[in-house]
């Protein structure tokens, strides 16, 4: 069995692993993987999630911190959806949109065996993007029979009427197995008029989009003789959503954005079992994500609609790899094992405006990689002694060569130490990196000429003009991070149902890509921006900016004269930001039997502290605990009780308040309660055999999100990255298995 976070079969990872199995998903009433990851305290709901609305771009995620197509992306530690790697059965998926997010909710949860999340840097194992960590969706391998199901639900305050239909079928034979599933989920929007704290916003502004999702998946495994196994994973999804943003009461029209995304994946692999317990693996993956946005302006008086913008963001990915894993020699704790491999990837991205026939970004990136990982079990069961019951060392290294920025090497060292059978201590140190997104590299560059006063200039002559450049930067380097993780797990033999783990983590994330000029109106003379402004431009420097620009805009009202250029403002993407992230995770669980059934108490919580510095001349500022950024404290605690065919669960979710950085006021915290009741008739051969009923209530007490003073009339008065406007949501589902 392969564990996420290591390529060693049956190996241990020195990093904590969060495992959420299909049974837990069912017990807690989750119906898609988006709901699952939003329940994980280590994950930030900002970035690409359906409830994120206008205004969230003020957070550290910038333009990536908004909802484009209704998907849900992992965003561990709030480092961004492009800094968490998402895998399906251990293999990469195509990026979605220009923010390089992967929509995990498009994978049908009915086919999922478990999701494993490693909230620790893992570039030494998986390469680029695994800075905040990695999430691996593992599909069910053996499924027998057919299950059909339906779910209906809605918010009691109005909106989000949901209709879901799914079918899953599978079979197992002596040498293999197959599972296939299809799901259709449609949901109505939540309008601002349906929530009293937002009903003064322009109608029909939406707080939560309406959507329609079709998703299908097939997974096959087949043994060929005794030494070869073939596996194929494939899925296809299509999601449509309607959003009504950016509308104010002062307008005579409103905007409608109709978005559609289509994702495809084909991922074959071959495992060859060699002599001496060695395994050779050959795998490939092809995936594509095409997202379109049609923005139209609707006249209120006449109802006529005119398309003002139509874009396509298309991502294509292809990869192949070959690897080997097996034992090297014997140690007192077991076999020392080695995993080695190499491969290549190619990603391509195009963002175009179909109305004008122009591209906003167009580029591709290829990379080559090689890796090695060692596991050295020095002491194990049967070979331990007083004070050392278990001792294992791990080491991994990976090298990648990218077309744009060249080579990068990421090592990782780990220790697993068990002083007694009741305690396990883990520690890891490693380097991670993230390649710049293709949008950051290849977005078109725009040059603009305007008066010095426009940029806040004082004392300039009447003819003085300022030349600015913004957009992509093909000379970007990789973002790099150093990560430390130390955890202590308590699993006493005297209480076999008790488990608890406490983790400390620290991330030093440098060379983050940002747009350095955030306030163009006060750029000139501001010491924070001095390193990005050339106050003595040469003719060569001016010509270089214009030669590299894809478009030039003259807003001075006068003919362009290079002699009038008094300064150049460089506002394109650049590697200058540094983030410091540290915190503590806690995850206890206790399972015990009662006369009335089995009770399981489990929970998870995190405390996060993070800051960011944009350039050496600028001061660091807080990220965690500020509006549109991760809250400092998040937690989820609850209980599951089961007796026979009946299961009930109740969980409390807590998110601490965040500070509005404009008026320095802190919002209230947000506490909700989720409950789920399940009843299964069991398999007894009758007409009611194989039925499963579930009633779920999210936000049982209908808590409204904490409010703040929104910066504009078209923004809702709450932080949509941390808090939800849905309110109480009731759903009922039924399924039957043959």
Protein language model regions, located:
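Short loop/turn motifs that connect adjacent beta-strands in outer-membrane beta-barrel proteins
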Residues: 46, 142-145, 158, 174-175, ...
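C-terminal beta-signal and adjacent terminal beta-strands/loops
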Residues: 508-510, 609-612, 653, 657-659, ...
